[in-house]
């Protein structure tokens, strides 16, 4: 009798796991990070020419999905800056922490990071902190514009069977700690 109940429970759990794959597709932090690696070396000129401007190159982007704040993605990364200001030319490095709202675009089959904003930035050398505070609004706008146009992740029809189904049947996204779930049903 116990063997029968165990076998029945095993079959039911196997069916539930199998059915779960038919009702949703999950994208992990690791997959998002691999996709974000394509955004490494994002470069942009920002600031007020002649007053304070910088050429910025973004590297080492990594994500944390839904861990710090529900329904948000937190990105960390480095930025190399070549800055020109009234004080002359300087080089600096920054550690950035960004937050964004993941949004699914069904037409493109892509996840975009909207409402991108710098929530923390530390600069080395520290004496550049004041100049960086001047440039921060420009950096925020440049990153927001870039990530509004460039998807963080694109579903591929030639990918796995689940990914192809997600591209065709997606009904939006759900942000869970460590993953983004794309349900196929409402």
Swiss-Prot record:
Subcellular location: Cell membrane
Residues making up the signal peptide according to the UniProt record: 1-18
Keywords on record: Cell membrane, Lipoprotein, Membrane, Palmitate, Signal
One Pfam family, short name: DUF1439
Lipid-modified sites (N-palmitoyl cysteine): 19
A cellular component annotation (GO) from this entry: plasma membrane
Record's bilayer topology term: Lipid-anchor
InterPro entries in alphabetical order: DUF1439
Main location, first listed in the record: membrane
Covalently attached lipid (S-diacylglycerol cysteine), positions: 19
Name of the molecule in the record: Uncharacterized lipoprotein YceB
Organism: Escherichia coli (strain K12)
Lineage of origin: Bacteria, Pseudomonadati, Pseudomonadota, Gammaproteobacteria, Enterobacterales
The gene coding this protein: yceB
